[in-house]
């Protein structure tokens, strides 16, 4: 008889499994600097899911050129605004902020979240005074605009940092300066194109405190062990020595409301209007009537949750731009 063996239940790569610090997800890495100069991120609000019928454009696939049904997530993506430019420098302890310049005219809702300077800076003087050799990275402080999404009743904007990529360092600095001087308004279509692959980050649906069976996926007790009064507890907390409980032991605790980033999510369509809204609206969201994006598959988080996108850092296939969508289902999700 072979020696019985199996991997442990649950991944330690996600520990400690605690609540996310903020409902705005963060990106710790960005794509390489190739292509045109532009922002490398955008954000929207998850409305719900539906399905579309599109023509399979994958080469050599058994269904190439045929109509296929694909599940999609509808993300409402109204225009965002850029409020400031922040420059970073390299230090022995990582990248640290070097300086920042705020726009002269910021949105009134931003005062509810941040202490915005009374007067903005002069970007031209900043470019002339700074030595580009000191600059390690250029990022833009962007935020959503409350009221642009009727399904998300928020008064405070969601603020985040978005990297400027592509071109040379001087080109990126000029792009960021021009962006905030022109009002900072930018759309999802200015950053992405239908058919591209992106990484979607969000805060998952919170489930509160759960036991080890649901939290870690351990097996329930069987047979005689199940007749000891409980079935959903682990057998023991570890050996006598070392006389402590190790962090690898599956125990009950917080489940859900974690930040998760899903790689290589294909953008099926970038459009404007109420076409994807089902009969009766999306449950817990309502109607989508404005700029929206259809993402293949699911994205982390419940309805109304903020979802951030960036260009794929590890694409597993070449992008197939502008897929042909022939039908978007608007059947009611309420039965």
UniProtKB/Swiss-Prot annotation:
GO molecular function annotations of the record: RNA binding; rRNA binding; structural constituent of ribosome
InterPro entries given in the database record: L3_arc_euk (IPR045077), Ribosomal_L3_dom_3_arc_sf (IPR044892), Ribosomal_uL3 (IPR000597), Ribosomal_uL3_arc (IPR019928), Ribosomal_uL3_CS (IPR019926), Transl_B-barrel_sf (IPR009000)
Region (Disordered): 1-35, 234-256, 312-335
Keywords tagged on the record: Ribonucleoprotein, Ribosomal protein, RNA-binding, rRNA-binding
Compositional bias ranges of the Polar residues kind: 244-256
Record GO cellular component, one term: cytosolic large ribosomal subunit
Keyword Transcription regulation assigned: no
GO BP field: translation
Family: Belongs to the universal ribosomal protein uL3 family.
Known role: One of the primary rRNA binding proteins, it binds directly near the 3'-end of the 23S rRNA, where it nucleates assembly of the 50S subunit.
Assembly behavior: Part of the 50S ribosomal subunit. Forms a cluster with proteins L14 and L24e.
Record-linked HAMAP family: Ribosomal_uL3_A
UniProt protein name: Large ribosomal subunit protein uL3
Name of the gene encoding the protein in the UniProt record: rpl3
């Amino acid at each position: 008889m072979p020696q019985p063996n199996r991997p442990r239940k649950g991944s330690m790569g996600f520990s400690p499994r605690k609540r996310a610090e903020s409902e705005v997800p963060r990106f710790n890495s960005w794509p390489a600097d190739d292509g045109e100069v532009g922002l490398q991120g955008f954000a929207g609000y998850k409305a719900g899911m539906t399905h579309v019928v599109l023509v399979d454009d994958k080469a050599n696939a058994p269904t190439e050129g045929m109509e296929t049904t694909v599940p999609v997530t509808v993300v409402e993506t109204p225009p965002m605004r850029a409020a400031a430019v922040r420059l970073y420098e390299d230090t022995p302890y990582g990248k640290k902020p070097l300086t920042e310049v705020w726009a002269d005219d910021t949105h009134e809702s931003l005062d509810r979240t941040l202490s915005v300077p009374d007067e903005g800076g002069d970007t031209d003087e900043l470019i002339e005074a700074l030595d580009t050799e000191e600059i390690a990275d250029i990022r833009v402080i962007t935020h959503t605009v409350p009221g642009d999404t009727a399904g998300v009743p928020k008064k405070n904007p969601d603020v985040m940092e978005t990297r400027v990529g592509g071109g040379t360092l001087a080109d990126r600095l000029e792009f960021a300066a021009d962006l905030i001087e022109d009002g900072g308004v930018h759309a999802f279509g200015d950053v992405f194109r239908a058919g591209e692959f992106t990484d979607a980050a969000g805060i998952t649906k919170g489930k509160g405190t759960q036991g080890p069976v649901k939290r870690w996926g351990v097996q329930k007790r069987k047979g005689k062990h199940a007749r000891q009064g409980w079935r959903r507890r682990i057998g023991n907390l570890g050996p006598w020595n070392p006389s402590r409980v190790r962090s690898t032991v599956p125990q009950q605790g917080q489940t859900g409301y974690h930040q998760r980033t899903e790689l290589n999510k294909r953008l099926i369509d970038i459009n404007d209007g109420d076409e994807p809204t089902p009969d009766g609206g999306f449950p817990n969201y309502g109607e989508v009537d404005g700029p929206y994006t259809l993402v293949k598959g699911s994205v982390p988080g419940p309805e109304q949750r903020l979802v951030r996108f960036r260009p794929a850092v590890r694409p597993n296939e070449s992008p197939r731009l502008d897929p042909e969508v022939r039908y978007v289902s608007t059947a009611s999700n309420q039965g």
